Amino acid sequence: MSYYVTTPIYYVNAEPHLGHAYSTIGADILARHMRQRGEDVFFVTGTDEHGEPVVIAAEAQGTTPQELVDRNAPRFEALLERIDVTNDFFIRTTNPAHVAEVQKVWQQIYDNGYVYKGQYEGWYCPKCADFKGEHEIAEGNTCPIHKIPL
């Protein structure tokens, strides 16, 4: 049997920290275990170089998002070496091959009628990077975790 093991793809809005190492080590343990059992394993990790957290961090540092991710992504790769992770591939979402493949997949989804134009309204926390339901919102329409306005 073949196994695909992955970590989250990490935002590169800041340097890597213990949380990044923790989840990567967990995935590495699983990949190593499956390989020891003789299983075919493909283990991937990498960086998500798009999104509001990256834009906000770049603006705060007076740089462009691309400059920020180009500075921080190698730090994530260096972390993998430092903790001796056995990943097979490191993905950067700004890699041209990745961009082309994603565009191809999205085109197929669109061509099959699964993408449509519409509107969505909701309470969004950029630090959580998700929408909050009415039952999750703190007093004053704030994020209960980050205490910022939504």
Place the predicted regions along the sequence by residue.
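N-terminal, positively charged nucleic-acid-binding surface of large information/translation enzymes
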Residues: 1-150
